[in-house]
């Protein structure tokens, strides 16, 4: 019995020794499996480092670890629902804008498109830190974890924040708690237009932004570099085909509503329309149409078909031009400068047609008056007997002697030849030779052409002179107005 117990104790001891020899090898195998290439191991500093540590400098690894701890500490207990300085001071947000592209501008929708880098700077005491770097560049991921201004664009119809290939946002944190937040935006903003001077018009397209929820007692806005340098437009930033960007004016406004007073930052971009397109498409065709309508004054007044074609064609052409010129404009209730020009041109063209109608009317009346004499003369011819001879003699015979006579000069003989009746007396004073015949003026139904109408003669001078005077006054007025507007913008 004792021997059996000793043998069992001996076997248990051998088994224990065997297990002691096996376990260290097993532990080494497990650790070797964990340290495969590409795996990470814990370091004493508490960070993560690759197995191939010489590839990454130790100081860089230390900075990453340090700032990771700093950010974790800053965000620990940070409430992004509360603005900086809540209950103590007003939060000041400084802004500036860099315009990368401006345009296009839509006249029909009265809006414009602008692509900008929008920058905002503010101070947050909760984000102060001490570290090896004074400025910490960050990406957009931290922006969702901290408080940011609730800026919106008052006259923006649609705004797009670019997200390709990642959200185009930049966040920089300074050790004193100052933050710089930059984003790239494409904004479709409203631009009220007054088109009375179209197409020599100038517009001030505003860009207005401010806080949506915070009043002036909580958040105020200011320009980072002052009013002169806080808004900058790139040299090649204009995307305008019909406008020139003259400049911009920066300002600040206070608006009042039922919820309080709000600060609104404003920038007005001044645009001047290019007139070249409209000169080619509208003004020159109108001028040429008016000149063409005045060509009819130099045609014969009996050329009814030609002058009718001139008048009707030019009127229809002006109607077509006026309709096409309005297609590129919004349907405003007032007349523009182009409308006035086309209305005057239309009046000249229509007046030329009326002038022809007047001349043609009086021309037909004169033919009718001449035609009245023909039936009366034919009636007289039937009642008065005439000598059946075809030739009228230009001589007369007195006592056997023949003398030549000029009936056109001698009025007495002309009266005798026209008014004397055949006498039955046996002793006539004047004995006509066999060649003598009775002279009778009988009108014929022949159409005679009228001379140039006095109305046409006057119109050839009056119409061109009046049209030239109108053009001088029209262009002088709007060119001077354009210079005054440009001078006003430079002063601002």
From Swiss-Prot:
Q: Please provide one cellular component term from the Gene Ontology annotations of this protein.
A: chloride channel complex
User: Which residue pairs form cystines in this protein?
Assistant: 191-205
| Topology term for the membrane | Multi-pass membrane protein
Sequence positions bearing Phosphothreonine: 427
From the Swiss-Prot or TrEMBL record, give the protein name.
Gamma-aminobutyric acid receptor subunit alpha-3
The residues exposed to the Cytoplasmic compartment are 296-305, 358-457
The record's annotation in Pfam families points to: Neur_chan_LBD, Neur_chan_memb
Q: Which GO terms describe its biological process?
A: chloride transmembrane transport; gamma-aminobutyric acid signaling pathway; inhibitory synapse assembly; synaptic transmission, GABAergic
């Amino acid at each position: 019995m004792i021997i059996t117990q000793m043998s069992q104790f001996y076997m248990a001891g051998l088994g224990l020794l065997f297990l002691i020899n096996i376990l260290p090898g097993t532990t080494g195998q497990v650790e070797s499996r964990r340290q495969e290439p590409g795996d990470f191991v814990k370091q004493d500093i508490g960070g993560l480092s690759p197995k191939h540590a010489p590839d990454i400098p130790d100081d860089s690894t230390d900075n990453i670890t340090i700032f990771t701890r700093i950010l974790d500490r800053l965000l620990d207990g940070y409430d992004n629902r509360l603005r900086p300085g809540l209950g103590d001071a007003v939060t000041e947000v400084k802004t500036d804008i860099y315009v990368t592209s401006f345009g296009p501008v839509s006249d029909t929708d009265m809006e414009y498109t602008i692509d900008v880098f929008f920058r905002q700077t503010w101070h947050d005491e909760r984000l102060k830190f001490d570290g090896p770097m004074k400025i910490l560049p960050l990406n957009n991921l931290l922006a969702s974890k901290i408080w940011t201004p609730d800026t919106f664009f008052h006259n923006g119809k649609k705004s797009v924040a670019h997200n390709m290939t990642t959200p185009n946002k930049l966040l920089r944190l300074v050790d004193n708690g100052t933050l710089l937040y930059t984003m790239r935006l494409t904004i479709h903003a409203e631009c009220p237009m007054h088109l009375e001077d179209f197409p020599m018009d100038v517009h001030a397209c505003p860009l207005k932004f401010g806080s949506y929820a915070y009043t002036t007692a909580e958040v105020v806005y200011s320009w980072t570099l002052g009013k002169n340098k806080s808004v900058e437009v790139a040299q090649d930033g204009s995307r305008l085909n019909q406008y020139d960007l003259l400049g911009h004016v920066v300002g600040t406004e206070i608006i009042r509503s039922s919820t309080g007073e709000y600060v609104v930052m404003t920038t007005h971009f001044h645009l001047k329309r290019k007139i070249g397109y409209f000169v080619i498409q509208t003004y020159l065709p109108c001028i040429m149409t008016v000149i063409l309508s005045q060509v009819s004054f130099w045609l014969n007044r009996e050329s009814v078909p030609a002058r009718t074609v001139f008048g009707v064609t030019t009127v229809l052409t002006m109607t077509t031009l006026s309709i096409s010129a309005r297609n590129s404009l919004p349907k405003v209730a007032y007349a523009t400068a182009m409308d006035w020009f086309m209305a005057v041109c239309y009046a000249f063209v229509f007046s030329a047609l009326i002038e022809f109608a007047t001349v043609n009317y009086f021309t037909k009346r004169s033919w009718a008056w001449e035609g009245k004499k023909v039936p009366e003369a034919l009636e007289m011819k039937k009642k008065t007997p005439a000598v059946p001879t075809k030739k009228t003699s230009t001589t007369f015979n007195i006592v056997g002697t023949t003398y030549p006579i000029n009936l056109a000069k001698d009025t007495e003989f002309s009266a005798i030849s026209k008014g004397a009746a055949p006498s039955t007396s046996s002793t006539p004073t004047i004995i006509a030779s066999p060649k003598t015949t009775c002279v009778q003026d009988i009108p014929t139904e022949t159409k005679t052409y009228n001379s140039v109408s006095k109305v046409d003669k006057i119109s050839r001078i009056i119409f061109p002179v009046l049209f030239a005077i109108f053009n001088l006054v029209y262009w002088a007025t709007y060119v001077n107005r354009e210079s005054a507007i440009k001078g006003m913008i430079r002063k601002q």
